[in-house]
Structure formats: structure tokens, C-alpha cells
């Protein structure tokens, strides 16, 4: 019996065939090469095409309201990755759209959601601050009431895709005297508002992220999400979705999309490296052992679920990519048209940071899965402060 391919019903097989043909038409070699060169992880033409075809809306909606079935959703995720679709920022947009739906006013929902699902609006995250690290609750970006609106001042790091987005899901401090989890308010800030400045930052893997500055940015109260000083409730919902700690559905097909797609890149990179070696080299016991060990590690990481998979995949990419460079020798450090080892090596560094650092995830596993206490960051007795 062949377990390499799942037998689909006629409806799902047709869905897969149509989706595969659609992606082959819009995700061209030029799109993939341009995305690799720019590091944007986004292509507006592809995004608008997906919106016009109704795929974005069906991905966002629950099945009961016209969204994908569980099997179709899995097909969708796999085909998106298979086509190398510049895609990672849709997960952010969809997550923020959920927050707008759950916590926004009717007026804000009407303004944002329809154009988001058509692909015309994109949404990004404004959590981390230049000096804040992973603890986003230490927010210093201030929002102060001004009549029936708000004035915002501050800055945010890692506002990825802000240069293609229309709104930022912005965490602000509205009550500096209160405990940090009771001082926060969330806003959906239009990025074309006066006083917003988006500046690029290049990561070691060639991706583009941004730092955004907010200087006397004035917005109406209708852009507030949730209660004043109740932003932690709004934020926790989004963070649980980003970290993959909440149940996505009842089918067990939860998936941290970015991690899985990068694991598939590792699989392709491994194949490219093996194919680039002369037959005599591959036949050497030491090389065959290292390639085989890499395959086993990659397969184990891909099959690891939830939070554990997030750690396993990022760790595998970080540890296996230098192994592949070493096997290739001097050529392993050179860029090429193929998916080369040096690209995977550079990709592995930020992969352990975005979506929540590996340290944060290990602490989450320790607390929520193993039942251990919260981590203690205080210096040991007698140690240096």
C-alpha cells in the first residue's frame, strides 16, 4: 500500500487540481526570484489574485461560513508551500483581521475587513520596541487622550511588511502608573496617518523588516480595539495565535505555516546539496552518514507538532545548514540560482527569533506542557548584578 499520497474525494481532488493550476499561473519564476532578491516575503500581484479568486476569504472564514473544510485547508497550506508562494505575511494579516472582528467597532469592521479579504488591505504587527526585547508588556509607546481621539508617540521594531501594509496592530501604554498588564491599549493605526515613518532594516538572511516611528500621530477613538487599559486581553488572543498555543481546529492539523515552509526549504536545500556533489564524494561513508543524519533530523522536526515543532524546526535548520555548507566545501558559502546552503544558514538565524524566540517557546513548553514554574531571571546569590 502506498502511504505517500492521501486518497481524496472527487470534490477535494478537484479543489487541489484547480488550486495547483492557479498557483502555477500566478507564482512564476520571476515572482520567486524577485522575492528572494527583495526579501519582502510578499508579492502584491499574487496577493490580489488570491483575493480576487476568493481564496483569502475562504482561508479566513470558518467552514460553517463558507471557509475551507479541514481537508481543503490542509491542501491549501501544502500547495501554497509547494509553489513557494510569497506568503508569510498573510498569517499576520489574518490574525489582526480576527482581532478587528472580535474587538473592533462595527464601523471599523466595515472599513477594514472586506478590503482585507479582497487583498487590497494588509495588516502588520507593532508589538516589540527597540529596548523591549521579548517582553512586549514593557511597552513605552504612549497613547494619550486628546478630545475624542488619541495622540501616539513611540517606536516599534520588527514591523515586518509595514511598507506594504495599510494598518498596524499597535500596542500602546495608556496608563503608565498602572501595573504593566493593566496599562495597555490596542489600536489599529492607519499607516498613512501623519507622523508615521517606516524605515527598512535588513536581516542577516536578506529579509526586509522595519522600524516604525510614531510622532504625534492623531487617530480617532474608533481605531481602538477593546477597552482602554484592556489591551492585554486583545494582545493575548493574538499572541496565542502567533505562537500556536491555541487550538486552531479539532482535526489535529494545526500548523505554524512559516516554520513548516522553511522546513520544506531545508528539505529542498538538502536535495540540492546532495545533487551538487560528485558521485564518489556522496559514496564516502562520512558524507553519506552526514547527509543521512540530516534527513533523519529534518523528518523528525517536520513530524513534531505544535510548540514543540516550532523549536524542533528552527533548531534543525540552524544546526543542519552549517553541516550542509561543510559537506559542500568552499562552494557552500557561495550564492547560486538554486536553493543553496549559505542561504539556509542565513535563514536559520532569524528563524529562531520571529514569531517568538526559541527561549520564549522553551519557557512556554516548560510551564504549560511540563508544569514547571516561571523562569527566574534574577542573578544567583553572590553573583554579579
Residue ranges and their predicted role:
Residues 1-90, 111, 115, 269, ...:
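Amphipathic, small/basic residue-rich leader segments at the start of a protein or domain
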Residues 31-38, 288, 292-340:
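C-terminal helix-coil-helix/basic helical segment that borders enzyme active sites and/or dimer interfaces
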Residues 141-144:
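A structural signal for short hydrophobic beta-strand segments in well-ordered beta-sheet cores
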Residues 153-197:
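A short core secondary-structure module
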Residues 4-8, 197-301, 351, 384-385:
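Glycine-rich beta->alpha junctions and the first turn(s) of the following alpha-helix
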Residues 119-127:
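A short, Trp-centered hydrophobic/proline-enriched beta-strand micro-motif
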Residues 3, 71, 76, 234-237, ...:
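Glycine-rich phosphate/cofactor-binding loops in nucleotide/flavin-utilizing enzymes
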Residues 52-119, 161-167, 298, 302-309, ...:
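Internal helix-loop-helix
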Amino acid at each position: 500500500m502506498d502511504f505517500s499520497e492521501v486518497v481524496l474525494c472527487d470534490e477535494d481532488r478537484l479543489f487541489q487540481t484547480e488550486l495547483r493550476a492557479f498557483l502555477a499561473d500566478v507564482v512564476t519564476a520571476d515572482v520567486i526570484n524577485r522575492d528572494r532578491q527583495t526579501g519582502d516575503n510578499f508579492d502584491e500581484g499574487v496577493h490580489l489574485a488570491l483575493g480576487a479568486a476568493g481564496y483569502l476569504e475562504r482561508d479566513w472564514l470558518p467552514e460553517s461560513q463558507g471557509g475551507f473544510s479541514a481537508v481543503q485547508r490542509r491542501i491549501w497550506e501544502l500547495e501554497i508551500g509547494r509553489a513557494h508562494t510569497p506568503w508569510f505575511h498573510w498569517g499576520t494579516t489574518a490574525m489582526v483581521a480576527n482581532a478587528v472582528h472580535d474587538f473592533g467597532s462595527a464601523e471599523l469592521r466595515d472599513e477594514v475587513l472586506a478590503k482585507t479579504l479582497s487583498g487590497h488591505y494588509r495588516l502588520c504587527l507593532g508589538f516589540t520596541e527597540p529596548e523591549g526585547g521579548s517582553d512586549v508588556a514593557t511597552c513605552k509607546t504612549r497613547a494619550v487622550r486628546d478630545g475624542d481621539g488619541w495622540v501616539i508617540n513611540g517606536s516599534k521594531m520588527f514591523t515586518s511588511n509595514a511598507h506594504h501594509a495599510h494598518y498596524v496592530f499597535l500596542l500602546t501604554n495608556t496608563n503608565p502608573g498602572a501595573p504593566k498588564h493593566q496599562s495597555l491599549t490596542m489600536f489599529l493605526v492607519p499607516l498613512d496617518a501623519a507622523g508615521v515613518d517606516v524605515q527598512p532594516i535588513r536581516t542577516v538572511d536578506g529579509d526586509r523588516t522595519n522600524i516604525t516611528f510614531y510622532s504625534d500621530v492623531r487617530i480617532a477613538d474608533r481605531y481602538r480595539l477593546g477597552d482602554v487599559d484592556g489591551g492585554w486581553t486583545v494582545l493575548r488572543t493574538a499572541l496565542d495565535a502567533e505562537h500556536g498555543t491555541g487550538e486552531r481546529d479539532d482535526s489535529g492539523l494545526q500548523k505554524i505555516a512559516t516554520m513548516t515552509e522553511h522546513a520544506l526549504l531545508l528539505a529542498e536545500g538538502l536535495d540540492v546539496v546532495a545533487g551538487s556533489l560528485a558521485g564518489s564524494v556522496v559514496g564516502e561513508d562520512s558524507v553519506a552518514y552526514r547527509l543521512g543524519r540530516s534527513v533523519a533530523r529534518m523528518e523528525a522536526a517536520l513530524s513534531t507538532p505544535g510548540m514543540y515543532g516550532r523549536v524542533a524546526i528552527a533548531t534543525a535548520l540552524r544546526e543542519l545548514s552549517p553541516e550542509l555548507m561543510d559537506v559542500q566545501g568552499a562552494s557552500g558559502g557561495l550564492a547560486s540560482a538554486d536553493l543553496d546552503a549559505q542561504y539556509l544558514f542565513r535563514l536559520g538565524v532569524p528563524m529562531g527569533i520571529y514569531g517568538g524566540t526559541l527561549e520564549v517557546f522553551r519557557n512556554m513548553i516548560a510551564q504549560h506542557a511540563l508544569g514547571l514554574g516561571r523562569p527566574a531571571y534574577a542573578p544567583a546569590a553572590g553573583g554579579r548584578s
